[in-house]
Amino acid sequence: VTRFQNQFLSAVKQLGWPEIEDLQNLESCNGAQRALRTISLDGQRQDTASRYLHPKLHDNSHPNLHVVVESQVIRVLVDDDRAVGVEFRRNPLFNKGDETSSRNRVVKARKTVVVSCGALGTPLVLERSGLGDPAVLERAGVPLVVSLPGVGHEYEDHQLNVYPYRSSLDPEDTLDALVGGRLDVGALIQNKDKILGWNAMDVTCKLRPNKEDIAALGPAFQKAWDRDFEQVPDRPLAMINPVNG
């Protein structure tokens, strides 16, 4: 817990926004939360691979778990409207000079195929598999398997505004010395300095404007609000993430 974290939460409470223990519960809005950490006390990132896959790969209890790295998914194989496998290849960027890298391989599924390639990658895999908007697939020369016009449709990245502020924070309460090169990164790693487990983000907010805010933003905003947000009370319009830079 940092001094800034407590001060920020105190300030937002004065504006009427409560502190919420889990702001990522898909329901809460108009509140603030202490930032959750994915860095362990020894400075190691606690990602999916290190916390889930690696332990199971080395516990000798999951012989059916195989992880294929440096590879690319080409498409999902579909038979009679059912996903039955995945076609993939070794990524040529990591296997230069290897003739086998150009050969496509197939893994069959007995139960389920899960496509989890992110907001940008997943639609591409589905479309290469023939699942998507017929017009898009026709232009790309991909045979239509299932008509799903919503695949990749109207995806919009979020907008970002950055505002710098002067503060009374002490130098050790920010990343300024690290970003400015005044700290020896090698020494920090060797000594497992706690600053390496901190991304300078201590708190986050999910917010929706009130009626006065909406009216002040003009008729175009009002129209967009009424269409996309008014009837969805758990959909935030903006997030605030202070960074102690």
Language-model-detected regions and their locations in the chain:
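Mid-to-C-terminal "cap/lid" subdomains and adjacent gly/pro-rich loops that border
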Residues: P123, D133-G245
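Short, solvent-exposed loop/turn and secondary-structure capping segments
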Residues: V78-D79, D98-E99, L124-R128, L137-R139, ...
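Glycine-/small-residue-rich beta->alpha transition segments that form the dinucleotide
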Residues: E70-Q72, R110-T112, S116-P123, S129-G132, ...
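Short acidic, glycine-rich loop/turn motifs
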Residues: E87-E99, L207-D213
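Non-transmembrane alpha-helical segments in soluble domains
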Residues: L9-K13, L53-L57, L126, P134, ...
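Core beta-strand elements of the Rossmann-like FAD/NAD(P) dinucleotide-binding domain
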Residues: F94-C117
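Conserved redox-cofactor binding core of oxidoreductases
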Residues: V1-D79, A83, Y163-R166, T174-G180
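Secondary-structure transition/capping motifs at alpha-helix termini
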Residues: D59-P63, P92-G97, S101, L131-V145
